[in-house]
Amino acid sequence: MNYPINRQDYAAMFGPTVGDKIRLADTELLIEVEKDFTTYGEEVKFGGGKVIRDGMGQSPIINGDDDNTAVDTVITNALILDWWGIVKADIGIKQGKIFKIGKAGNPYTQDNIDIIIGPGTEVIAGEGRIVTAGAIDTHIHFICPQQIETALAAGITTMIGGGTGPAAGTTATTCTPGPWHIHRMLQSADAFPINLGFFGKGNTSKPEALEQQIKAGALGLKLHEDWGSTPAAIDTCLTVADLYDIQVAIHTDTLNEGGFVENTIAAFKNRVIHTFHTEGAGGGHAPDILKVCQYDYVLPASTNPTRPYTINTVAEHKDMLMVCHHLDPNIPEDVQFADSRIRPETIAAEDILHDLGAISIMSSDSQAMGRIGEVILRTWQTAHKMKLQRGWLAPNIDPETHYDQSEQDSDRGNDNYRAKRYIAKYTINPAIAHGISQYVGSIEEGKLADLCLWKPAFFGVKPELVIKGGMIVWAQMGDPNASISTPEPVYMRPMFGAFGGAIGATSMTFVSQAAIELEIPKQLGLTSLVAPVTHTRDISKAHLKHNYTTPEMRIDPETYEVWADGELLTCEPVSVLPMAQRYFLF
């Protein structure tokens, strides 16, 4: 017998369903549920008098690896927001990996069940929650280990970068130089409940030192201007990368000492490269580093301190730059260096290039002119600002499927495509760029269950739960001495997944294939799940989800004005942002 229920009551009980819209935090962004995997009337929910009880929604089936056994964990009635869609579903987790996205329950009493709940199944309530893939930050200065706590509390589950601690080289550049430092950082990684990978230093005109670092366990190489990003170093680094299937990241030559942007592009020789600081102020060829956005072999990323362009951005950046790059405000040349790097015109253009999908990746530049805990937050602030200033975003026609959803989105008044474009910038696209998308970066079957649960009102600001390799690793938790878990003070605290042997069983360390073949993980006694990066050299910008546009770029060297496909890119700084004062005391 059917029982009618109105949408409001249904959403309160089981979360939104097809046709319902959800506001992301306090932004002007609205997403709409595109599909619901449930069978109406057969939804599963845990609690007193609810469905997941023996003989009802819970079966007597044991846990196991195959499709006909129960899952270890089920997230019920979750609203999934990912690059591939915005759907309502149950999520089944087995052995720390995403087993199935579909309908959970008891196959003995319910139809259309593909996620079996049994006595050995834990339940995480996803009703009224948005679930996203754990964020990936590929621009980490490993200056202090406390960054990892901040990252996890913000929803980041993978950190890629370089460094050895608060050394001068690390505070300025993202390199872990030499095999000894690489080995020590790999051993240190075992202590942290997060996925990690380290760049070797890529600045040399001879290949031997680069090969040594790759074989030691670097997952990639980093070229940084402070070490000399010359055309010779670029060419050598990319040549070695092609031999070993690892990615190269580059911070180009701000001062144009070793060559101009055209010389750097020529040194690329059409080989794929991940360009850091493809932006308005963070570094790289002044003033025209944004030119690289037009090339299909360039995977462009920007960092979060300029995101989005506000009335405070320029002033803040000058002070940050002087500290990060050891500049002296009493030396005129140092001041000129700072002024050339902080340009309002190119910062404004950076906003729009993100909205066009021409800048494909968002990252932090942690403690080196960027904030590790604000990658997600500032991505969505940028999306909000662009909706206010540029209006509804029409989707590009997908180059692989040729699917155009613009009519659907515009008629329904949702921001689904803009949401997919922006979430891809810190999830699947950095994973593709660094050869780890087969493990992480999206909510897809077979990938590591690195997931974040958000209350919609706190989306992008403060996650409710962070799941790492299928286990809760960080969560909003109240007073441990209270009679229940919710009394104040409630804040993000480490959970059981962040301790002991659970860390190694749920976290990955990414290295080169060469290091795997040389058995470096075994020699170092690593306890985490170690995996090689792959397919970093046979990709292009076209492989990056929803962020693959390559407009013809022109930057005026005197006025710093930016054009894309003949259109002047300019926008006003804002004085008020969402996801800001409303959520934080300081």
UniProtKB/Swiss-Prot annotation:
It catalyses: urea + 2 H2O + H(+) = hydrogencarbonate + 2 NH4(+). The active site is at 325 (proton donor). Residues 134-586 form the Urease domain. InterPro entries: Amidohydro-rel (IPR006680), Metal-dep_hydrolase_composite (IPR011059), Metal_Hydrolase (IPR032466), Urease_alpha_N_dom (IPR011612), Urease_alpha_subunit (IPR050112), Urease_AS (IPR017950), Urease_asu (IPR005848), Urease_asu_c (IPR017951). Pfam families: Amidohydro_1, Urease_alpha. It comes from the Bacteria. The modification N6-carboxylysine is found at residue 222. It is found in: Cytoplasm. One of its GO terms (cellular component) is cytoplasm. Carboxylation allows a single lysine to coordinate two nickel ions. Substrate binds at residue 224. Pathway: Nitrogen metabolism; urea degradation; CO(2) and NH(3) from urea (urease route): step 1/1. Binds 2 nickel ions per subunit. GO terms for biological process: urea catabolic process. Coiled coil: none annotated. Keywords: Cytoplasm, Hydrolase, Metal-binding, Nickel. Its EC number is 3.5.1.5. GO terms for molecular function: nickel cation binding; urease activity. Its cofactor is Ni cation. Heterotrimer of UreA (gamma), UreB (beta) and UreC (alpha) subunits. Three heterotrimers associate to form the active enzyme. Belongs to the metallo-dependent hydrolases superfamily. Urease alpha subunit family. This is Urease subunit alpha. It comes from Gloeothece citriformis (strain PCC 7424) (Cyanothece sp. (strain PCC 7424)).
